[in-house]
Amino acid sequence: MIDEIIEDAQDRMGKSIEALKTSLTKIRTGRAHASLLDNIVVEYYGMDTPLNQVGNVSVPDARNLSITVFDKSMISAVEKAIMKSDLGLNPQSNGTLIRIPLPPLTEERRKDLVKVVRGEAEGGKVAIRNIRRDANSDFKSLLKEKEISEDDHHQAEDSIQKITDVFVKQVDEVLVKKEAELMEI
């Protein structure tokens, strides 16, 4: 019973870390990466379609992205979708290929992004602590129903706290890595 609760909490904490990493990849650093455009949707024959289904995104170098659109008539729609996204990118088309130069981030913009990243990381920590709280309340209800002893209850709370500490440390490591990426010129 206790092991199931702990295992479930570990799974949920792992998913929280993955969700944090996913949300941080959407924050633009000075480097080009294809996942930067993952959330962009293009109107394709009346339907909203993810950009990666309309064209192929590649990274020719650290400061540029390029998109090869499968249907050449969609180039202007793809450009509009990129401009509408609030990434601050200006696509340039040569008829068959869309190039997106990534302007270097200003110092002020970097600091703003670091604040955003810290907020995301704090949200990840809060999610992990909420999972710990849920597990602890499950342990308390088991104790009230006399399904576990007082000693088992304390051991379970200690082990869930140790697991929580490990995951919070992982959040801190992800945060430090992303901050370093942002402050790199």
Curated annotation (Swiss-Prot):
Belongs to the RRF family. Responsible for the release of ribosomes from messenger RNA at the termination of protein biosynthesis. May increase the efficiency of translation by recycling ribosomes from one round of translation to another. Keywords: Cytoplasm, Protein biosynthesis. The gene is frr. InterPro entries: Ribosome_recyc_fac, Ribosome_recyc_fac_dom, RRF_sf. This is Ribosome-recycling factor. The keyword Protein biosynthesis applies. It comes from the Bacteria. GO terms for biological process: cytoplasmic translational termination. GO terms for cellular component: cytosol. One of its GO terms (molecular function) is ribosomal large subunit binding. It is found in: Cytoplasm. Its main location: cytoplasm. It comes from Colwellia psychrerythraea (strain 34H / ATCC BAA-681).
